């Protein structure tokens, strides 16, 4: 009988070679996630730069949206496809453009290109954080936190227009274009009175407050026993001891508020929880808007305001303002619908 001594090694395959090359130590880590991230990010950014530089929105929105037409950084945009395109993916080789690149740009194909590559690019970036965290034995909280902006992007740019009649009703990729979309959301959905929007605002602004308080508190309680010229040179990045005094910080905030965090883990988890929860709530709210779910309606106030000219609240004024936004934007944004509003549905009262 023959006894083989040693460890059995499986035969290496092309997958092992690819894994070695993709995950080797280099200045910019590639990894398996990079196969998704880098091409998608390149195409999304390249498509946006191309669109804002050269491509008009005359055929989709009746607007000038490129630097070539006289726009600047704040007014240029890659606009959504025409309303008649519905939810078509608008491939260059598809039945709409039929391989004609110019026609594809005129129909709004660049928007679909940027939106889809952008979504997969963001997902690739989250996978990159998972992959690197696994490689260096970190927990995956960075990737989990980044799921929040991904949820917002996907809900606003993809799910909302999927619930409506077409990509036309998604935001265009531009600064002023996003502002107009926000006004649209307010006028047609009363978004500011939606509880999910309120939770989102509380999460984002609460996170900003927590960030400012945390940074100031750490700066306030830094140990000074270093020989460096300033705060940033006083400590070695590989030091074993603490940089700041948690005990002093706890004492300070206990005196200010009467309560304070005494545990660093809970403190930092709370700083993660607040913005991530807020953004996720916003994303859920936008999914609701895709289904045309309504915000709060205080009908009793509306009825009383309609019957009593001396009764008005900030709510009833905002409702009138929303009616004005709808009456103005619908005819402007959708001239092809030939919308005609009878007098009784046009804004009334003194809100405008």
From Swiss-Prot:
It catalyses: 2 a plastoquinone + 4 hnu + 2 H2O = 2 a plastoquinol + O2. The chain crosses the membrane at residues 40-60, 124-140, 152-165, 207-227, 278-294. Phosphorylated in vitro. Its EC number is 1.10.3.9. The modification Phosphothreonine is found at residue 2. It is found in: Plastid, Chloroplast thylakoid membrane. Chlorophyll a PD2 binds at residue 197. One of its GO terms (biological process) is photosynthetic electron transport in photosystem II. Chlorophyll a ChlzD2 binds at residue 117. One of its GO terms (molecular function) is oxygen evolving activity. One of its GO terms (cellular component) is photosystem II. Pfam families: Photo_RC (PF00124). Pheophytin a binds at residues 129, 142. The keyword GTP-binding does not apply. InterPro entries: D1/D2 (IPR055266), Photo_II_D1/D2_sf (IPR036854), Photo_RC_L/M (IPR000484), Photo_RC_L/M_CS (IPR055265), PSII_PsbD/D2 (IPR005868). Fe cation binds at residues 214, 268. The D1/D2 heterodimer binds P680, chlorophylls that are the primary electron donor of PSII, and subsequent electron acceptors. It shares a non-heme iron and each subunit binds pheophytin, quinone, additional chlorophylls, carotenoids and lipids. There is also a Cl(-1) ion associated with D1 and D2, which is required for oxygen evolution. The PSII complex binds additional chlorophylls, carotenoids and specific lipids. SUPFAM superfamilies: Bacterial photosystem II reaction centre, L and M subunits. A plastoquinone binds at residues 214, 261. Photosystem II (PSII) is a light-driven water:plastoquinone oxidoreductase that uses light energy to abstract electrons from H(2)O, generating O(2) and a proton gradient subsequently used for ATP formation. It consists of a core antenna complex that captures photons, and an electron transfer chain that converts photonic excitation into a charge separation. The D1/D2 (PsbA/PsbD) reaction center heterodimer binds P680, the primary electron donor of PSII as well as several subsequent electron acceptors. D2 is needed for assembly of a stable PSII complex. PANTHER family: PHOTOSYSTEM II D2 PROTEIN, PHOTOSYSTEM II PROTEIN D1. 2 of the reaction center chlorophylls (ChlD1 and ChlD2) are entirely coordinated by water. PSII is composed of 1 copy each of membrane proteins PsbA, PsbB, PsbC, PsbD, PsbE, PsbF, PsbH, PsbI, PsbJ, PsbK, PsbL, PsbM, PsbT, PsbX, PsbY, PsbZ, Psb30/Ycf12, at least 3 peripheral proteins of the oxygen-evolving complex and a large number of cofactors. It forms dimeric complexes. This is Photosystem II D2 protein.
